[in-house]
Each structure stands twice: as C-alpha cells, then as structure tokens.
Design a protein with these regions (language model features):
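P-loop NTPase motor module signature
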Residues: 2-212
Length: 212
C-alpha cells in the first residue's frame, strides 16, 4: 500500500506537470510529502486511522476516496464503519468508494442508498498456461524454482516484454531472485519487490530498461 500511494501520487503529479509534495502529495509511514499547497493527498489506510485519533471529524478533508474496497482488512472495515457514522455529523463530507469487484447495490444500501456510478474499464486478452509441479518429488522448493526457470526461458523466447513473478513472501522472493541472477540471463535485470525495501529500491521497478 505504501508503494501504491507513492507511485499513484507520482503519476498524478506527472500528469499535472508538477512535483510530488506540491498540489499532489502523499503520506505513508516514515515519509511525508505534503505541504500547505497540497490539494490531493494519497495515503495508506493506516495513516488515515492515525489521523482520526487527532481529528475525529476529519475536518481537513472535504472528500475521501476509499480505493480497492474489496481488499477486506481490519483497517478498511473499520474505516468504512467509521465514515458511515461520521456522515450525519459531516453532511458536507463526500465519500467515494471504488472497486472492480464489490457488490455495489449492497454498499449503496449500507450508505443510505448512495448513487452508483459505473465506469467501464479496458480488458486485455489473457492466456493461461498451466505448468504443474511434479508432486512426487521430494524437493518441492527445487521443483518450484525449476518450474519458474522453465517459464522464464519459455517466455524469453517469445516476447521482449517484462516478466512478473508472484511469490508468497519476502524470503521466497529473495531466494528466487538470487537463483535467477545465477542464471546470468541475457538483457535481463532481476528486481525483487517487497514491503521492507527502501523507497529507492522499490522505485527501480518503474525505471526503464534496455532489456527486460
């Protein structure tokens, strides 16, 4: 979520031809790029919860957008409940809840039959290739790595595009990145991405590269 807040703020600032921290700012843990001139602030749910402790009526905001509301978490559930209770005391406050997969009718009823606005998105063709890991093998971790190696090799021969690999945790990400680096893949840079990386290390995934 911290990475998303930073990158979305940077993208909006770029679209408006301004620098982050000006009219477009963001605030995440350990990083506050907000000024007196900030009109749009992107933040994590944890930051908004912390602000509620000091500003229970959220008077510094006239509009709050809760994005990806379907990603259920204790923070999001608490915020949605709190904002519903806050609206009678802040009738001027506008709440916008966005999601691609929630039940809009149910959310509308929860917020006193709030209007529903549907925005059509762009769809892309998706091809699914199933490569099962051999279940009889004793070394499951090695089988998983070999399956990743095979998939990377297969994709490298077909398209110049980047390859995104999802892993279950930080350790698995680091181990897989180390293993891929040992392959010395041509024109390929291996970039791990997880929450504990520094901002500069996370931002490397958005930088252009001559290869993949």
């Amino acid at each position: 979520r911290r990475l998303a807040a930073r990158t979305v703020a940077n993208r909006i600032a770029e679209e408006l031809k301004t620098e982050p921290g000006g009219c477009i700012g963001y605030k995440v843990r350990f990083s506050d790029h907000v000024s007196d001139n900030t009109m749009v602030k992107l933040m994590t749910d944890g930051i908004l919860l912390a602000e509620i402790q000091q500003d229970r009526l959220l008077m510094q905001y006239d509009t709050i957008i809760i994005d990806e509301a379907h990603e259920r978490s204790l923070n999001i559930d608490f915020l949605l409940g709190y904002l519903k209770e806050l609206l009678p005391r802040r009738p001027d406050l506008k709440i916008i809840i966005t999601s691609a997969t929630i039940d809009p009718e149910r959310f509308s009823r929860h917020f006193n039959n709030a209007p529903i606005i549907e925005v059509s998105g762009r769809t892309y063709p998706v091809e699914v290739r199933y490569r099962p890991i051999v279940e009889e093998a004793d070394d499951t971790e090695r089988d998983q790595l070999q399956a990743i190696f095979d998939a990377v090799d297969e994709l490298s021969q077909e398209s110049p595009g980047d390859i995104l690999i999802f892993m279950s945790g930080e350790r698995e990400i680091r181990d897989t990145a180390d293993a891929l680096n040992k392959l010395n893949l041509r024109h390929t840079e291996i970039l791990p991405l997880y929450a504990r990386l520094s901002n500069s290390e996370q931002n490397r995934v958005f930088q252009s590269h001559s290869g993949r």
